[in-house]
Regions:
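Basic, low-complexity intrinsically disordered segments
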Residues: 68
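Active-site-proximal polar cores
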Residues: 72
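Acidic, mature catalytic/reactive cores of soluble proteins
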Residues: 2-62, 75-78, 83-892
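Transition-metal
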Residues: 65
Length: 892
């Protein structure tokens, strides 16, 4: 049997070693640039109103581009995407439509049906599907009906409109395959699923991002590029730094024509002033949909061009269109023909081989399909992200200054300079990086593209992202907001995963560790300002989980000490300790830092468990609660939320054999045990023979009491995972009076019923993959220590007792069931829509939602959150190992 690496792995190696630039091109084009903070130059800071969907077809973007299932280079200079028209829509379908935050009854929401079906890390093969209705798209109906609905009602979706009745729609599949890093084959397959022949206009479109309208731009060419008619049925695109590319197209299937214009704003339409260019961004729309042929260039040149196919497709029939985007230095023997199809087959076979080596072979076919789809979504969600904060704040040279108030947003982040391909939470709903989401992305990515995972973890720690004070940027709406500090966990996790069978990348670990020291210090100085080792932290990514907005001062003027904030900092210490000990293997200096984090962990553990009433542990309820301190009094907020389990996450295994070489560390630990016994006694347990230690915030009794609630189906245990809020609050809502107002916390298993944080998120009941993943992971840590000596009742009161490893496996199965078809073919995440169970053109399609209804499993929020919901791939890959001690899967 050959031991040679598979071709995709070899491409990854060539790219990492800069032998061949396979990552130059990829599906890095955003699904939405309109309505983003980057494009918002208003005084009010309302990006949805300032740059709505209706402007997107006519207005040049300043900081990026978007398109339908498109492709671009790593600096988003030249873009390729689809445009479609069914002859009935009022506009070309050039980009995905969705409701803005104010329009949706649960915040912003994409109202399209599209699916990321396959992808390889180098984008040597990618496939996606868009379902395009044959009737007029119901833009206004979606806006009006959702506007009529309250937050306590279901969202009105595209399928609810009846537009897909009688299967009157097209399946539009797009595939990309790379022959070389700069020779990209494109195949469009359009299938008429309806009962009658139907017409469709298909416009593969090539355009340059507008970098010439804004004056001198850092690192960008300001020379206007050009796209013109080339020889032998092709477009020729010339760019100062990218070079020359040709888009060849088959001159068949309706004898296509080429339409040319410029990617410049239609000022006349939007602002009622004269256009600076004769041909503007929306000219192709005007020519095709409105019949205004004079709108496009008669000279066959511009910065945007489309190949216009007019197709009539019989019922049940399929048409295939072939294109090829190549650098001028390439000279393929035959652009199309048999070799074209052979190369697609070859790249797909190579993708199969690549994933066969990265998906657990013992998984059944249904699980393998979910894992592959999760990886596809993760790779399609890589996006070119560009923002120079100082330039955004001050405005562009030669342009009017932004209005007063504009520069107030992120005013403390003038150093931030982003010009990278990054993994996005969701390419439409969240087309911007989120620091804590990114950590989960990188852990998942490390299985298939380890260099990208490491690079993205490091880039947020670099001086052009990280603040000089050590804070990591949260997200573009407010870089200074606080996200859970999971970055050290991700760094350690990625390092350990890649350590198995490979040479450890200590350079990566050390680079990250040094910068994380700055971030840790920032947290301690800012969020533990009283020095009592109980932390605040604000909303910490859990949005509406508290009684009030935790990112703002308390309405009664008190101080909030958070169970999750304190738990996260203990979690931080655990992973910094693990990294310091690993680095100490080759540099004794790190022993001192390991001692520092052991000591700090002990201090946090003592504080959070304070027996004198000063801590967050409630002995009566056996739970961790947030605490309000006001006028010398302490009051627990008795909200049974997943935040109360976060101190449980701070646990790791320390074996004598692993630390015996660190004499300084061991000596210091013994000193602490002798002279600060309360600190280590409360956080360090040892096995019977004294060779293995468990470092944990929790005692065994506390762990058992927490797990009693965690595994209670009347509280946190759902058929589909761990709820973010106890079901107890459904009948017993918490009422808290502060500042003359009453705040209520109750159990809401699906979408949120308030407008907090935009209304499109809810941590008061639903199931969230990232927290479930961390709970599963730490259960394995506890299992490695306690083994058979600790058995729990799962579910609580069921009479079924099992080890923590077995409980973790059971919980993992519940999470997996969200995505797996049941006996009737229904995936719970798809809700009650029967098409996904019964229709052969729908039942293999899988969406990865932001969160899930705790009682039904229905997907909620963003529908393409791969993103952190791709972590289900890791859970499935772990399937055979839940009760084993396989190294590398936990931070022992």
């Amino acid at each position: 049997m050959s031991t040679a690496p598979d071709p995709e792995s070899e491409r990854l190696r060539e790219d990492a070693q800069r032998e061949k630039h396979w990552s130059l091109w990829g599906t890095y084009l955003s699904e939405r640039q309109w309505g983003t903070v980057r494009e918002d130059y208003s005084a009010s800071g309302d990006p949805w109103t300032y740059f709505p969907h209706d402007h997107a077809r006519s207005r040049a973007y300043r900081w990026g581009e978007d398109g339908l299932l498109g492709l671009t280079d790593e600096h988003c200079r030249l873009c390729f995407g689809l445009a479609l028209w069914n002859g009935a829509d009022p506009i070309l379908k050039e980009r995905l439509f969705g409701l803005t935050g104010p329009q949706g009854n649960h915040g912003e929401d994409v109202k399209e049906l599209y699916y990321y079906q396959d992808a390889t890390p180098t984008h040597s093969y990618c496939r996606a599907l868009y379902k395009y209705p044959q009737r007029s798209y119901p833009y206004q109906l979606l806006i009006d009906e959702n506007g009529r609905r309250g937050r306590d009602q279901a969202e009105f979706e595209l399928l609810d409109s009846g537009i897909f009745a009688e299967e009157r729609y097209f399946d539009v599949s797009i595939e990309y395959a790379k022959a070389t890093p700069t020779d990209i084959l494109i195949r469009l397959t359009i299938a008429n699923r309806g009962p009658e022949a139907a017409d469709i206009h298909v416009l593969p479109t090539l355009w340059f991002r507008n970098t010439w309208s804004w004056g001198a731009i850092e690192e960008e060419s300001t020379v206007r590029p050009s796209i013109s008619a080339g020889e032998n049925a092709r477009l020729t695109a010339v760019h100062e730094t990218l070079g020359t590319y040709h888009l060849a197209y088959e001159a068949s299937n309706g004898a296509p024509e080429c339409l040319y214009t410029d990617n410049d704003t239609n000022r006349a339409r939007l602002f009622g002033v004269a256009n600076e260019r004769a041909h503007v961004k929306d000219a192709i729309h005007e020519a095709v949909v409105l019949g205004l042929r004079a709108a496009v260039s008669a000279e066959a040149t511009g910065t945007k061009a489309a190949v216009h196919y007019r197709l009539s497709i019989a019922a049940g029939s399929t048409v295939t269109l072939r294109l090829r985007l190549t650098s001028a230095v390439e000279n393929p023997n035959a652009l199309f023909g048999a070799r074209f199809e052979e190369l697609f087959a070859q790249r797909l076979a190579e993708a199969d081989r690549f994933y066969a080596g990265r998906i657990e072979p013992s998984l059944d076919a249904a699980r393998k399909q979910v894992v592959r789809a999760a990886y596809a979504g993760l790779l399609w969600s890589k996006q070119f992200y560009n923002l120079v904060q100082s330039r955004w704040s001050s405005g562009d040279v030669g342009h009017p200054a932004p209005p007063p108030g504009h520069a107030a947003r992120n005013a403390q982040w003038m150093h931030l300079y982003a010009r990278d391909v990054l993994s996005m939470p969701d390419n439409w709903e969240f087309p911007y990086f989120c620091a804590w989401d990114s950590s989960f992305h990188c852990v998942c990515l490390s299985k298939i593209d380890p260099e990208l995972a490491k690079r993205q973890l490091v880039v947020f720690l670099r001086e052009w992202y990280m603040h000089r004070n050590g804070q990591l940027p949260a997200y573009e709406f407010a870089f200074s907001d606080l996200n859970p500090p999971v970055h050290p966990w991700a760094v350690w996790r990625v390092y350990r995963l890649l350590e198995i069978g490979q040479q450890p990348d200590r350079g990566f670990l050390e680079r990250a560790f040094q910068k994380l020291l700055l971030n840790f210090t920032w947290w301690v100085n800012r969020e533990d300002s009283d020095g009592n080792n109980l932390f605040a932290g604000g909303f910490l990514g859990l949005d509406n989980i508290g009684a009030f907005d935790r990112s703002k001062p308390l309405p009664n003027g008190g101080a909030l000490r958070q169970a999750d904030g304190t738990g996260w900092m203990a979690f931080y210490c655990v992973h910094m300790l693990s990294m310091a000990l690993e680095l100490a293997r080759s540099d004794d200096v790190y022993q001192d830092l390991a001692s520092k984090f052991l000591e700090h962990f002990g201090a946090i553990s003592v504080a959070v468990n304070g027996s004198d009433g000063s801590g967050l542990w409630d002995e009566q309820d056996g739970f961790y609660y947030d605490r309000v301190e006001l006028a010398g009094k302490v009051e627990p907020l008795r909200v049974r939320a997943v935040a109360g389990f976060l101190p449980m996450l701070a646990a790791t295994i320390i074996r004598n054999e692993d630390v015996e070489q660190f004499s300084g560390f061991v000596r210091r630990a013994k000193w602490d045990a002798k002279f600060r016994p309360a600190q280590l006694q409360s956080s360090l347990q040892v096995n019977a023979n004294g060779t293995v230690h468990l470092l944990s915030v929790l005692t065994r009794e506390q762990l058992e009491r927490l797990l009693h609630r965690l595994f209670d189906e009347e509280e946190f245990l759902s058929p589909f995972g761990i709820r973010s809020m106890s079901r107890f609050h459904e009948q017993h809502p918490l009422m808290y009076v502060a500042g003359g107002a009453t705040y209520t916390v109750d159990y809401e298993p699906g979408e949120g019923t308030t407008g907090n944080f935009g209304g499109n998120s809810n941590w008061r009941g639903p199931i969230w993959l990232p927290i479930n993943y961390l709970i599963l992971e730490v259960l394995r840590v506890y299992h490695l220590f306690y083994e058979e000596s600790l058995r729990v009742e799962f579910p609580t009161r069921s009479g079924q007792w099992m080890t923590l490893g077995e409980a973790a496996r059971n919980l993992a199965h519940r999470l997996q069931s969200l995505f797996l078809p049941d006996g009737a073919g229904r995936r719970p995440s798809n809700g009650t829509e029967l098409r996904y169970a019964n229709d052969p053109h729908w039942r293999e399609l899988i969406l990865f939602y932001e969160y899930f209804h705790a009682d039904t499993g229905r997907g909620c929020g963003a529908s393409h959150q791969t993103g952190w919901t791709a972590m289900i791939a890791d859970l499935m890959n772990l399937e055979p190992h839940w009760t084993s001690c396989k190294p590398g899967f936990v931070g022992e």
